[in-house]
């Protein structure tokens, strides 16, 4: 993920390949699969993408992340009227908020389905359209609320800059506080709603952009996140069995018996970690939100139309890279 992110961010050709050419080709591929499935073609009905990655969430996430990457390229390269328009600088906030709300909706869906399953089967296990048993409950509701708060932990919505060499789109006011709040919230989302993928799209996929932003790519966490997320979603949509079966498959402790078989209703569950992490997610997001408003109030500013973290180490290091 780190390597592909570097290729995509350092050249226009790399960015256009990963976020325009490849998505167009994959869209044609996905369309062909669903047309084939609609006509009862065996190759389509048994295709990995059709069997394991058919939920609304995965497609929404893939295309929302990809549109984000394209928008970030427009901003950092100042392409056309959009790339030079002041109003378009809030695009990163809008697309990130959309991505968060997609996950929030999925969290609430899992809670509702878990409660419905409890009424009908006496268990909170419910089977997703992709053949994964999920365990919906109050942790989904609390994490959904944490996600909504996380949206409003983004500050300085119009304070978007291009780096001096135009490799990067900078959001200097998005410092480590937001990154921490987002990472914990998003990990809890993947742990609860994509449990069989949580090692990859949870731990690894969150560490990749955070590592890059912390070490060499200051102020660019959101671009790193969008790039790695979009590229991973494309890979996982085409080759989902990489993480679903075989030596690379990982199951969380939720599956108390250590088995996830779509044909067999699970018995025992251990949702303890989901509860612990979701409480941590909610607490961290509330604390970050409070810090933001405390700083904004002391400065007498609106934290969404103005930058809140001017003067902090993260902010100043990012601004040192910005075009003046």
What residue ranges belong to the model's regions?
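Short, structured coil/loop segments at alpha-helix boundaries
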Residues: 11-14, 81-85, 132-135, 139-142, ...
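An N-terminal, globular interaction/scaffold subdomain
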Residues: 1-91, 95
